[in-house]
């Protein structure tokens, strides 16, 4: 018999696990309300599908519209120190990924992923001849990175990315919008008044990316619909042997740039559940 307990916060779950009769708990380390566990426990990491990425505004951005700065777009992956982001802003509890597939997935290729890892010199080389739009005074414009400021980890990550890009020669600022700013993050996304954005979504267990690339897809911000990539998504869903090609095409294209994948943490009282093998959709799986 499994008895479920209700809780109103991550801290309450943690406290009841540590000091009361709760034997099993699940936590999301990417959550702002994450609470650290400090007792004796057994721990499982379960891939969650939570996906943090950079999206490019290919339709309206002065940096990228009309096919501008393809080399810059494709080189953004080399400017991202993913492990530094995870260590600084996600408590070291996430998986760095250069591909739109979690490293814990059977569809992930380490050899392919290594081609798109942090390489600042390669990024600097790629942007030497980039187009930089000017304002009415003839001054170079900053690249603007949109972020949802209601998520503190994502906000800190965006500020770090802007600083890193600036240090590498691409002057970048942040656009910080959320529920407390009057104008919401989604309103700015819909308006298209940004150059790149730091997004987060939850992908299915099959890593279906079709909502990024289908016409009017729920994740196709910035006009990134692409029939070639959409068809490759369908081919991967039909035959898992095609995920390598899909991941390569998405990484080479650069309209979405993976940063990291999250995972759930499943805690159990030591010795209580020796044969537990939790999955993302069933924490009680034996």
Which residues make up each language-model segment?
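Short helices/loops that flank or line small-molecule/ion binding pockets
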Residues: 10-22, 37-38, 71, 159-168, ...
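Append "and occasionally in soluble cytosolic enzymes with long acidic Gly/Pro-rich linkers
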Residues: 67-167
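A bilobed periplasmic-binding-protein/Venus flytrap-type ligand-binding module shared by bacterial periplasmic
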Residues: 46-75, 79, 88-89, 262-263
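Long beta-strand-rich cores associated with HINT superfamily self-processing modules
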Residues: 269-286
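Extracellular/periplasmic solute-recognition and catalytic clefts
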Residues: 3-60
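Ligand-binding "clamshell"
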Residues: 33-47, 191-193, 206-220, 269-273
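Extracytoplasmic/peripheral linker and loop segments enriched in polar/acidic and small residues
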Residues: 74, 86, 173-183, 210-272
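Periplasmic binding protein-like
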Residues: 17, 166-219
